[in-house]
């Protein structure tokens, strides 16, 4: 995609903005263009948002770089903290997603926690590869906190919200999923069957541990028994 939009929910506003600790929604869109005119043309729909008059900050079609973008992510993902994540691929419309995601955006449990609603469209046939699960929209939430005494509450917050998304979810991206807490498909059925066949050939005794299992018992309902 030439234009990659992501709607971020966070309690860390852009520099210079005071939101009083409340969550803010950031429509952060990056793109790769040949010239400024092309950038303005392809990003023009974003400049017609009906909520622009309520924006705390507006930046449109300005140059950026990795050096500009990376510190933003560093601030949102501080070292030395505890993290829990969950995610969903979906083809659901914004009309269907908004009531569910709105609750996630409004109730972020810590200053550092955040949620992303990523425009992945359009999906396309994938080559012969392990990555085989995707949708036109990618949603992920990350709880970030300091103390182990809060582990259960932080993990339950993110898991419970993504259970609410299951009716419209196609599956999960493995890198942001914790299958020991919530079962989810992460490969296309044919690809997963092929994986199991390869394991039967090369690891028939299952010496390699399934990380999505608890104490030797399958925790992921999508794994064949």
List the predicted regions and their residue ranges.
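Soluble FAD-dependent oxygen oxidases
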Residues: 1-225
């Amino acid at each position: 995609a030439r234009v990659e939009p992501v709607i971020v929910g966070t309690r860390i506003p852009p520099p210079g903005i005071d939101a009083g600790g409340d969550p803010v929604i950031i429509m952060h869109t990056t793109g790769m263009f040949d010239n400024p005119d092309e950038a303005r043309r392809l990003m023009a729909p974003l400049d017609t948002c009906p909520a622009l008059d309520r924006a705390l900050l507006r930046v449109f079609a300005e140059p950026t770089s990795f050096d500009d973008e990376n510190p933003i992510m560093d601030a949102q993902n501080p070292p030395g903290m505890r993290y829990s994540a969950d995610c969903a691929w979906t083809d659901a419309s914004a009309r269907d997603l908004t009531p569910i995601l709105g609750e996630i955006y409004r109730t972020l449990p810590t200053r550092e926690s955040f949620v992303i609603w990523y425009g992945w469209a359009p999906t396309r046939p994938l080559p012969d590869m392990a990555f085989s699960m995707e949708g036109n929209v990618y949603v992920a939430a990350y709880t970030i906190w300091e103390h182990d005494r809060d582990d259960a509450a932080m993990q339950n917050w993110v898991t419970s919200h993504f259970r609410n998304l299951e009716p419209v979810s196609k599956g999960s991206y493995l890198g942001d999923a914790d299958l020991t807490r919530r079962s989810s498909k992460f490969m296309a059925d044919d690809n997963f069957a092929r994986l199991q066949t390869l394991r039967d050939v090369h690891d028939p005794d299952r010496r390699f541990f399934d990380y999505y299992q608890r104490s030797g018992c399958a925790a992921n309902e999508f794994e064949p028994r």
